């Protein structure tokens, strides 16, 4: 039973994140800089509860982010305690390149991650107020990668 559960859990991966934004092109500026190997996979026009919106799928053959341009108002206050998305994170093999590409595209680091000898991480705010973390692991050992010292 334990082997079956372990095998099934390894088959589950995150396919996509669906984000409501205000401007798809501004949003793509950020994500294209972060993910130069990703592309717009498709898109179109749809309606969400009576409001028309444009949408795109931006990613690769296996994972993507959906951007829908029917957003109004501001994203949640990241310093507050409202229910909602705090941040999401992506693993990279070269965090310095991600930082450099985002800087060239006009995006500065919002905050540095905590000092840890097994990983480096930084946080950016995308054009819609979503906090996006990038992390580079400096070890292949799970006990080191997942250390909380």
Q: Which role fits each region the language model picked out?
A:
Residues 2-10, 14-23, 43-44, 53-57, 76-149:
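Vicinal oxygen chelate
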Residues 11, 18-63:
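Core segments of cupin and vicinal oxygen chelate
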Residues 60-64, 71-73, 95-96:
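Short, charged/polar surface micro-motifs in flexible loops or helix N-caps
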Residues 64-66, 131:
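Short hydrophobic-acidic sequence motifs that mark active-site Asp/Glu residues
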């Amino acid at each position: 039973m334990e082997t079956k559960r372990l095998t099934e859990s390894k088959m589950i991966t995150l396919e996509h994140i669906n984000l409501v934004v205000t401007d798809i092109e501004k949003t793509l500026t950020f994500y294209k800089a972060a993910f130069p190997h990703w592309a717009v996979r498709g898109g179109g026009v749809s309606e969400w509860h009576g409001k028309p919106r444009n949408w795109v799928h931006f990613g690769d053959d296996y994972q993507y982010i959906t951007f829908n341009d029917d957003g109004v108002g501001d994203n949640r206050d990241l310093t507050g305690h409202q229910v909602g998305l705090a941040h999401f994170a992506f693993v990279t093999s070269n965090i310095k390149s991600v930082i450099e590409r985002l800087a060239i595209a006009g995006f500065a680091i919002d905050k540095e991650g905590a000092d840890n000898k097994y990983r480096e991480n930084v946080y950016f705010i995308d054009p819609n107020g979503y906090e996006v973390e990038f992390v580079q692991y400096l070890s292949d050992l799970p006990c080191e990668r997942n250390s909380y010292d």
